[in-house]
Amino acid sequence: MRRPYPALAAHGALSRGTFAVAVLVSLAVLFAPADDVPSAPPGVDKAVHLLLFATLALSGRWAGVRAGVLAALLIGYAAVSEVVQGLSPLGRSASVADWVADALGVVVGLAVWARLVVRSPG
């Protein structure tokens, strides 16, 4: 039977609040107008996407959301965010590469969470 570290076991207000803050940050990052997005060297935006969605996956698991449900929701959210960026007057563009980075971030976040869960003796 798998048991998380004690600090990860409680799905209380702190874990749910952390997930809520991560979602709000993602909304601000993903839907900021193009003028508000700082310029960066090539590839940095993909790293930001990966880290953002890894954070969403980790905090979502800590909040108690089941892995399969969370993965489906986050990958769907990533796809919708790219479509909205492409269709909206934000001056942003849709990118399959961004979506792939988002999906990879979900996988990384879930893998890190799974690694934090340890097998209990017995």
Predicted feature residues:
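Bulky hydrophobic segments
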Residues: 1-99, 103, 107-122
